[in-house]
A protein has these predicted regions:
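PAPS-dependent sulfotransferase catalytic core
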Residues: 1-111, 170, 185
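Short N-terminal edge-element motif at the start of the domain
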Residues: 114-117
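PAPS-dependent sulfotransferase catalytic domain
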Residues: 69-71, 120-235
Protein backbone atom coordinates (compact mmCIF):
# COMPACT_ATOMS: atom_id res chain seq x y z
CA UNK A 1 0.00 0.00 0.00
CA UNK A 2 1.43 3.39 -0.97
CA UNK A 3 1.57 6.38 1.36
CA UNK A 4 -1.40 8.20 -0.19
CA UNK A 5 -3.55 5.08 0.16
CA UNK A 6 -2.55 4.74 3.81
CA UNK A 7 -3.49 8.36 4.53
CA UNK A 8 -6.94 7.99 2.99
CA UNK A 9 -7.56 4.55 4.46
CA UNK A 10 -6.82 5.72 8.01
CA UNK A 11 -9.12 8.69 7.49
CA UNK A 12 -11.94 6.50 6.18
CA UNK A 13 -11.53 4.00 9.01
CA UNK A 14 -11.70 6.75 11.60
CA UNK A 15 -14.72 8.43 10.05
CA UNK A 16 -16.57 5.13 9.94
CA UNK A 17 -16.75 5.39 13.74
CA UNK A 18 -16.21 9.05 14.65
CA UNK A 19 -18.11 12.16 13.63
CA UNK A 20 -16.42 15.44 12.71
CA UNK A 21 -17.51 16.88 16.06
CA UNK A 22 -15.94 13.96 17.93
CA UNK A 23 -12.67 14.28 16.01
CA UNK A 24 -12.54 17.99 16.77
CA UNK A 25 -13.25 17.29 20.44
CA UNK A 26 -10.50 14.66 20.66
CA UNK A 27 -7.99 17.09 19.15
CA UNK A 28 -9.18 20.14 21.08
CA UNK A 29 -6.39 22.38 22.39
CA UNK A 30 -3.46 19.99 21.92
CA UNK A 31 -0.20 20.62 23.76
CA UNK A 32 2.79 20.61 21.41
CA UNK A 33 6.32 20.40 22.83
CA UNK A 34 9.00 22.36 20.97
CA UNK A 35 12.72 21.86 21.53
CA UNK A 36 16.06 21.10 19.95
CA UNK A 37 16.87 17.39 19.70
CA UNK A 38 18.10 15.79 22.92
CA UNK A 39 16.73 18.57 25.11
CA UNK A 40 14.79 16.34 27.49
CA UNK A 41 11.53 16.52 25.56
CA UNK A 42 11.03 12.75 25.81
CA UNK A 43 11.13 12.96 29.61
CA UNK A 44 8.63 15.83 29.60
CA UNK A 45 6.41 13.97 27.14
CA UNK A 46 6.44 10.80 29.24
CA UNK A 47 5.61 12.77 32.39
CA UNK A 48 2.71 14.64 30.80
CA UNK A 49 1.20 11.55 29.17
CA UNK A 50 1.02 9.82 32.55
CA UNK A 51 -1.38 12.47 33.80
CA UNK A 52 -5.11 11.92 33.78
CA UNK A 53 -6.88 13.85 31.06
CA UNK A 54 -4.16 13.47 28.44
CA UNK A 55 -3.79 11.44 25.27
CA UNK A 56 -1.04 10.78 22.74
CA UNK A 57 -0.44 8.81 19.55
CA UNK A 58 1.91 6.39 21.29
CA UNK A 59 5.15 8.06 20.27
CA UNK A 60 6.51 10.70 17.94
CA UNK A 61 4.54 11.76 14.87
CA UNK A 62 7.17 10.79 12.29
CA UNK A 63 4.88 7.99 11.13
CA UNK A 64 2.12 10.49 10.40
CA UNK A 65 4.36 12.95 8.55
CA UNK A 66 5.89 10.05 6.63
CA UNK A 67 2.52 9.19 5.11
CA UNK A 68 2.33 12.63 3.45
CA UNK A 69 5.05 12.84 0.76
CA UNK A 70 4.83 16.64 0.53
CA UNK A 71 5.43 16.95 4.29
CA UNK A 72 8.69 15.01 4.28
CA UNK A 73 10.64 18.17 3.49
CA UNK A 74 10.22 21.82 2.56
CA UNK A 75 10.43 21.02 -1.15
CA UNK A 76 11.62 18.38 -3.61
CA UNK A 77 15.12 19.88 -3.52
CA UNK A 78 15.31 18.96 0.19
CA UNK A 79 16.43 22.46 1.14
CA UNK A 80 15.17 21.77 4.66
CA UNK A 81 12.44 19.96 6.57
CA UNK A 82 10.76 23.26 7.51
CA UNK A 83 7.01 23.42 6.90
CA UNK A 84 4.87 26.55 6.71
CA UNK A 85 1.22 27.46 6.23
CA UNK A 86 1.40 26.74 2.51
CA UNK A 87 1.98 23.06 3.23
CA UNK A 88 -1.35 22.91 5.09
CA UNK A 89 -4.10 23.19 2.49
CA UNK A 90 -7.64 22.33 3.66
CA UNK A 91 -7.51 18.70 2.49
CA UNK A 92 -4.10 18.15 4.09
CA UNK A 93 -5.38 19.60 7.37
CA UNK A 94 -8.37 17.26 7.37
CA UNK A 95 -6.33 14.17 6.56
CA UNK A 96 -3.50 15.04 8.95
CA UNK A 97 -5.97 15.52 11.82
CA UNK A 98 -7.73 12.28 10.91
CA UNK A 99 -4.45 10.38 10.87
CA UNK A 100 -3.51 11.78 14.28
CA UNK A 101 -6.98 10.94 15.58
CA UNK A 102 -6.74 7.37 14.33
CA UNK A 103 -3.72 6.79 16.61
CA UNK A 104 -4.99 8.49 19.77
CA UNK A 105 -4.70 6.56 23.04
CA UNK A 106 -5.28 7.70 26.60
CA UNK A 107 -3.43 6.72 29.77
CA UNK A 108 -5.43 3.46 30.00
CA UNK A 109 -4.66 2.69 26.32
CA UNK A 110 -8.28 3.30 25.35
CA UNK A 111 -8.39 3.94 21.60
CA UNK A 112 -10.32 6.93 20.28
CA UNK A 113 -10.82 5.27 16.88
CA UNK A 114 -12.32 2.11 18.36
CA UNK A 115 -14.81 3.80 20.65
CA UNK A 116 -15.01 7.59 20.30
CA UNK A 117 -17.93 8.01 22.68
CA UNK A 118 -16.21 6.11 25.50
CA UNK A 119 -12.90 7.90 24.88
CA UNK A 120 -14.59 11.30 25.09
CA UNK A 121 -16.51 10.67 28.32
CA UNK A 122 -13.72 12.58 30.05
CA UNK A 123 -12.03 15.59 28.37
CA UNK A 124 -8.51 14.80 27.16
CA UNK A 125 -5.75 16.88 25.63
CA UNK A 126 -3.37 15.50 23.04
CA UNK A 127 0.31 15.74 23.99
CA UNK A 128 2.53 15.83 20.90
CA UNK A 129 6.32 15.67 20.84
CA UNK A 130 8.53 15.29 17.78
CA UNK A 131 11.91 17.07 17.32
CA UNK A 132 11.02 18.31 13.83
CA UNK A 133 8.18 20.34 15.36
CA UNK A 134 10.80 23.03 16.05
CA UNK A 135 10.85 23.77 12.31
CA UNK A 136 7.12 23.33 11.70
CA UNK A 137 5.38 25.85 13.96
CA UNK A 138 3.55 27.75 11.17
CA UNK A 139 2.28 24.45 9.75
CA UNK A 140 1.24 23.06 13.13
CA UNK A 141 -0.48 26.28 14.14
CA UNK A 142 -2.60 26.10 10.99
CA UNK A 143 -3.45 22.41 11.45
CA UNK A 144 -4.17 22.91 15.17
CA UNK A 145 -5.24 26.57 15.50
CA UNK A 146 -6.12 26.15 19.19
CA UNK A 147 -2.81 24.45 20.10
CA UNK A 148 -0.72 25.43 23.10
CA UNK A 149 3.05 25.29 22.58
CA UNK A 150 5.61 24.47 25.27
CA UNK A 151 9.16 25.66 24.54
CA UNK A 152 11.69 23.43 26.30
CA UNK A 153 15.23 24.80 26.34
CA UNK A 154 18.40 23.03 27.49
CA UNK A 155 21.78 24.66 28.08
CA UNK A 156 23.99 24.39 24.99
CA UNK A 157 26.94 22.55 26.51
CA UNK A 158 24.96 19.51 27.67
CA UNK A 159 22.52 19.61 24.78
CA UNK A 160 25.16 19.78 22.04
CA UNK A 161 27.19 17.02 23.69
CA UNK A 162 24.10 14.81 23.68
CA UNK A 163 23.42 15.56 20.00
CA UNK A 164 27.02 14.61 19.13
CA UNK A 165 26.64 11.34 21.02
CA UNK A 166 23.37 10.56 19.22
CA UNK A 167 24.83 11.37 15.79
CA UNK A 168 27.77 9.05 16.50
CA UNK A 169 25.36 6.24 17.33
CA UNK A 170 23.05 7.11 14.45
CA UNK A 171 25.76 6.99 11.80
CA UNK A 172 26.84 3.59 13.09
CA UNK A 173 23.41 1.98 13.57
CA UNK A 174 20.85 4.06 11.65
CA UNK A 175 19.08 5.13 14.82
CA UNK A 176 17.97 8.79 14.85
CA UNK A 177 18.55 8.91 11.07
CA UNK A 178 15.77 10.90 9.40
CA UNK A 179 17.27 11.31 5.92
CA UNK A 180 19.33 8.24 4.98
CA UNK A 181 21.31 8.71 1.79
CA UNK A 182 20.61 12.46 1.72
CA UNK A 183 21.71 13.78 -1.72
CA UNK A 184 24.67 16.13 -1.47
CA UNK A 185 25.56 15.01 2.06
CA UNK A 186 28.97 13.50 2.83
CA UNK A 187 27.83 10.99 5.43
CA UNK A 188 25.56 7.91 5.24
CA UNK A 189 22.59 9.98 6.32
CA UNK A 190 21.30 12.93 8.31
CA UNK A 191 20.10 12.58 11.90
CA UNK A 192 17.29 14.53 13.57
CA UNK A 193 15.72 17.65 12.07
CA UNK A 194 16.94 19.19 8.81
CA UNK A 195 17.23 23.01 9.11
CA UNK A 196 17.78 25.42 6.23
CA UNK A 197 21.47 25.81 5.47
CA UNK A 198 22.37 22.20 6.19
CA UNK A 199 24.50 21.97 3.03
CA UNK A 200 26.97 24.42 4.59
CA UNK A 201 27.86 21.64 7.04
CA UNK A 202 29.36 19.35 4.40
CA UNK A 203 32.86 18.45 5.57
CA UNK A 204 32.31 19.86 9.06
CA UNK A 205 32.77 18.03 12.36
CA UNK A 206 29.96 16.42 14.34
CA UNK A 207 30.45 19.13 16.97
CA UNK A 208 29.74 21.81 14.36
CA UNK A 209 26.71 19.92 13.05
CA UNK A 210 25.32 19.50 16.57
CA UNK A 211 25.88 23.17 17.42
CA UNK A 212 24.15 24.15 14.17
CA UNK A 213 21.11 22.01 14.98
CA UNK A 214 20.90 23.37 18.52
CA UNK A 215 21.17 26.98 17.34
CA UNK A 216 18.76 26.67 14.42
CA UNK A 217 16.17 24.78 16.48
CA UNK A 218 16.06 27.32 19.28
CA UNK A 219 16.36 30.32 16.97
CA UNK A 220 13.50 29.10 14.77
CA UNK A 221 11.28 28.38 17.77
CA UNK A 222 11.90 31.82 19.27
CA UNK A 223 11.27 33.61 15.98
CA UNK A 224 8.03 31.77 15.23
CA UNK A 225 6.60 31.94 18.74
CA UNK A 226 7.19 35.70 18.73
CA UNK A 227 4.61 35.93 15.94
CA UNK A 228 1.93 34.25 18.07
CA UNK A 229 -0.18 35.69 20.91
CA UNK A 230 1.54 35.26 24.27
CA UNK A 231 -1.23 33.00 25.55
CA UNK A 232 -0.42 30.46 22.82
CA UNK A 233 2.88 29.35 24.36
CA UNK A 234 4.90 28.98 27.53
CA UNK A 235 8.57 28.42 28.26
Amino acid sequence: MNQASTVHQLSQQLRAHASQAQIDQALHKPVIILSAPRSGSTLLFEYLTQLQGTSCIGGESHRVFRNFPHLRAENKALDSASLNEAHADPRCIELFRDNMGSLLRDISQQSFAQNPALFLQQPKRLIEKTPRNALNIPFLNKVFPDAKFIFLHRAPQQNIASIIEAWTLGLRTGRFMTFPGLPGWDRPGWCFLLPPGWRDLVGRSLAEIAAFQWRMSNQTIIQNLAKLPAEKYCK
